[in-house]
Structure formats: C-alpha cells, structure tokens
C-alpha cells in the first residue's frame, strides 16, 4: 500500500475552486474521457467551458479545497497522480517513486499550488 498526503496551498485566485486529486495515469484518464490538452477553453465572457462531469471526478478522485490537506491510501499498482479542476483543466503528473516508510507504509508528501490566475485559466500544479 502507498499513502499520499497532499497539501494544497492557499491562493486567492483559486479560493473557491475545488480540485480533485486523481490516482493513476493522466494520459489514460485523458483518453478514457476524450480530453485533449491540459487546459479548458473559455467563452467570450471568460467563463470556462466544462469538459468533464463532477460525477466522473468524484468517482475517480478525491476533492481538495483551498488550504486543505488530505491523505489517500492507494494500491501498490498506482504509480502516479495528477489533479483536475471542475472544468477539466489538468495538472502535471507526479510519479510516485521512493517514498518514505512511515509505519511500514510507503508515504509521499505532495504540495499543490495554483498556476494561472485572474486573467488566465487557473489550474492545479504539483511542486
């Protein structure tokens, strides 16, 4: 078993945005749900064009709020994680290699921030 502890940094630009931490291959997820590219498009008013349903995100990942920390226990077969916004913008993919042993469990500490902002699309990013 593996455990990831994700801490999401507080950012004003994404204060009201939920992110989902999704275990598994980003490429496989994109292919399964027909996502092209990492970021969503915007309409003429600057609002994101949603390209994925919340039910899909809830079924495949765990929600994380601004400034929150979550812990997820994963199967040994999971080798990477990434994050997704409500609108379908995707983060970079983090590969889980050489975690610390804490109580006999391979543990990874991940810090998530937000890139983009007020004039461009906000999206999650693992540092």
Regions found by a protein language model. Give the residues of each.
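Short loop/turn and low-complexity linker motifs enriched in small/turn-promoting residues
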Residues: 1-127
């Amino acid at each position: 078993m593996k455990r990831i502890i994700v801490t999401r940094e507080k950012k004003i630009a994404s204060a009201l945005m939920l992110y989902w931490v999704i275990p598994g291959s980003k490429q496989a997820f994109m292919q399964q749900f027909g996502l092209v590219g990492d970021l969503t498009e915007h309409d003429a008013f600057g609002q994101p064009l949603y390209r994925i349903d919340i039910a899909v995100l809830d079924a495949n990942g765990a929600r994380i709020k601004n400034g929150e920390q979550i812990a997820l226990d994963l199967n040994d077969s999971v080798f990477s994680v990434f994050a997704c916004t409500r609108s379908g913008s995707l983060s970079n993919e983090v590969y889980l290699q050489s975690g610390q042993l804490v109580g006999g469990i391979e543990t990874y500490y991940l810090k998530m921030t937000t890139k983009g902002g007020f004039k461009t699309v906000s999206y999650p990013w693992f540092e």
